């Protein structure tokens, strides 16, 4: 899978970064714990987490008593989640969901940008097929209202010399709001969007 080498490098630093210790990414993850807590509080019943990473959201879901299954493609991320947080994150990703029984909620946080633009529709379709008829998909991720908004951010953070962040903004497959609306509409689904910080949006998709 693409980005696996990035995951290997990112894994040891991930928790520190999302908790604000890396100045370059601080704005990306403002209110990180609150955003994850909202996902964990909203998701009920049987919950699948895709792109669990080091298990931060998984842990919150379990603490709230949710029946949660979690998957991630990165050996390094899963090792941190399973060995240091006593979780059971299994191998899987957006196109490889190793469970047959449908879920009431599927949640994913800061992972959907690893899906190529031309594959996002199929990824959403795959996830929706793994939901119950009244199930919901929650996607929390960096998204952009327009190309201009994204380029303005890149210019601003280049001026701050946050070059790792701006490289990510130019190389990862971040979703544009209008494109997501088009995908959801073409699939005959419903979409609700709420902005959570300068970068993050929460998309709720239902049948």
Curated annotation (Swiss-Prot):
Its EC number is 2.1.1.-. Coiled coil: none annotated. Transmembrane segments: none annotated. One of its GO terms (biological process) is methylation. One of its GO terms (molecular function) is S-adenosylmethionine-dependent methyltransferase activity. It comes from the Bacteria. Gene3D superfamilies: Vaccinia Virus protein VP39. Could be a S-adenosyl-L-methionine-dependent methyltransferase. This is Uncharacterized methyltransferase Sca_1399. It comes from Staphylococcus carnosus (strain TM300). The lineage of its organism: Bacteria, Bacillati, Bacillota, Bacilli, Bacillales.
């Amino acid at each position: 899978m693409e980005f696996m080498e990035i995951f290997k490098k990112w894994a040891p630093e991930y928790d520190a970064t999302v908790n604000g210790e890396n100045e370059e990414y601080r704005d990306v993850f403002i209110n990180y714990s609150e955003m994850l807590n909202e996902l964990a509080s909203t998701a009920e019943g049987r919950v699948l987490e895709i792109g669990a990473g080091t298990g931060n959201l998984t842990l919150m879901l379990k603490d709230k008593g949710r029946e949660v299954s979690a998957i991630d493609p990165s050996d390094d991320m899963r090792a941190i989640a399973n060995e240091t947080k006593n979780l059971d994150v299994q191998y899987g990703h957006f196109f490889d969901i190793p469970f047959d029984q449908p879920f009431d909620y599927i949640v994913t946080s800061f992972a959907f940008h690893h899906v190529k633009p031309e594959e996002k529709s199929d990824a959403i379709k795959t996830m929706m097929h793994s939901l119950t008829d009244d199930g919901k998909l929650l996607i929390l991720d960096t998204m952009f209202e327009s190309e201009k908004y994204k380029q303005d951010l890149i210019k601003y953070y280049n001026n701050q010399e946050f070059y790792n962040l701006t490289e990510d903004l130019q190389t990862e497959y971040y979703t544009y709001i209008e494109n997501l609306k088009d995908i959801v509409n073409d699939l005959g689904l419903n979409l609700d969007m709420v902005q959570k910080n300068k970068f993050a949006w929460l998309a709720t998709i239902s049948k």
